[in-house]
Amino acid sequence: MLSPKRTRFRKQHRGRMKGKSCRGNRICFGRYALQALEPAWITARQIEAGRRAITRYARRGGKIWVRIFPDKPVTLRPTETRMGSGKGSPEYWVSVVKPGRILYEMGGVSETVARAAISIAASKMPIRSQFIRLEI
């Protein structure tokens, strides 16, 4: 699963997801892509599940680019713990996704294969998303 090798700080504020994605919202590598339509935190497990789904469906053909990386630690407190005594320890990593962000890209396959593979990956995501293709 994806996670940073090292970070400057162990814990982060939650932050807020305002507005649309201004970076990473254009197709750069492949011909087809999955684009987010809602804001969300997407976990490293969900990213990996989507990547595996696309890889399995596409078989040997094509290439996949994962355009998001989980770089935000999410902390959790142990269950049945009293309040206080600091913030919990980091449990998993998430990627902050805003509307318009490209999640996956695909190339080297026909549009029908890409559409089917990306729709399977889209069903693994916790948000609404759309299939887009590079207009040439």
Swiss-Prot record:
Output one GO MF annotation: rRNA binding
Which UniProt keyword terms apply here? Chloroplast, Plastid, Ribonucleoprotein, Ribosomal protein
Which residues does UniProt assign to the signal peptide?
none
Query: Which parts of the sequence are annotated with region: Disordered?
Result: 1-20
SUBUNIT field: Part of the 50S ribosomal subunit.
Biological processes, Gene Ontology terms: mitochondrial translation
Organism whose genome encodes this protein: Triticum aestivum
Report the locations given in the UniProt record.
Answer: Plastid, Chloroplast
Which family does the record assign? Belongs to the universal ribosomal protein uL16 family.
- A GO cellular component entry from the record: chloroplast
Q: What is this protein called?
A: Large ribosomal subunit protein uL16c
